[in-house]
Amino acid sequence: MSSSLRQWFARVLVLTQLINGALCWGKEGHYTVCKIAESYFEEETVAAVKKLLPKSADGDLASVCSWPDEIKHHWQWRWTSPLHYVDTPDYRCNYEYCRDCHDTHKNQDRCVTGAIFNYTMQLMSASENSDTIVHYNLTEALMFLSHFIGDIHQPLHVGFLGDEGGNTITVRWYRRKTNLHHVWDNMIIESALKTYYNKSLPLMIEALQANLTNDWSNDVPLWESCQLNQTACPNPYASESINLACKYAYRNATPGTTLGDDYFLSRLPIVEKRLAQGGIRLAATLNRIFSSKPKHAGS
């Protein structure tokens, strides 16, 4: 890894520590997904992830899971912006890879599902054949994959094309003017932390982990599974997200709407479950990648 990239990681980590609880959804949500995933890593995965992480991460994947958001506005990384989401036709409430996975210039496979397949393939090629390692930056591949599996579980990262996943829908979150996408990226989690967890992200993560071993325990094997022995299966995750976007995110959230307790209390369980699902599925994907068992990336 280059010295400049190491310096960037160090700077991001220091800022993360200084902010101390006032983090945006990108950091809070992605940290939560990756922290949950770490609890489900198999032994081979723990070793592989620690080997690939930058030294500044100190063996903690969660500490660098927001890196793709930190870099995407820098000119040399702008090409990654379309990889964080996939837009679908307005009001169809469904997702199709061949129809939807492209950037604004119609370059196919440039969307969040395509990115998950791509970075899965990169990590698999290295784990299966050491001769290919020189072709990919595996540290970046790990961080991109971990981040994008988080992104695809946010319903409005698989939203409508016409409103850019809710970014152009202006609403009020209680008294604060914002947009619908930001509500789901940030405001729901922020309000939950203040209302239920004394502004403590570790307490929220602990509560989600408790649900995974209790109320959701029967669902975990289903969340972990991929059809057809695939290593990565983001297409069903995208379909889930657009369905949830239509049923919960867009409903009763037209432009100019004030969203308050009714919206918050009915949508928070959706956000919490998507964070948990993202963590379980990230762990399952990385476990399949780094397992010695035969596998394939899928498509």
From Swiss-Prot:
UniProt-annotated glycosylation sites, renumbered to this chain: N118, N137, N198, N211, N229
pH dependence (record): Optimum pH is 8 with RNA and ssDNA as substrates.
Positions of the UniProt region annotated as Substrate binding: 147-196
Keyword Glycoprotein among UniProt keywords: yes
Pfam families: S1-P1_nuclease (PF02265)
Catalytic reactions on record: Endonucleolytic cleavage to 5'-phosphomononucleotide and 5'-phosphooligonucleotide end-products
Signal sequence range: 1-24
Residues where a divalent metal cation 3 binds: W25, H30, D151
GO biological process, one term: DNA catabolic process
Positions of a divalent metal cation 2 binding: H157, H181, D185
Function: Endonuclease that can use single-stranded RNA and DNA as substrates. In contradiction with PubMed:23620482, cannot hydrolyze single-stranded DNA and does not cleave mismatches.
Self-association and partners: Monomer.
Family listed: Belongs to the nuclease type I family.
Name under which the protein is recorded: Endonuclease 4
Gene coding for it: ENDO4
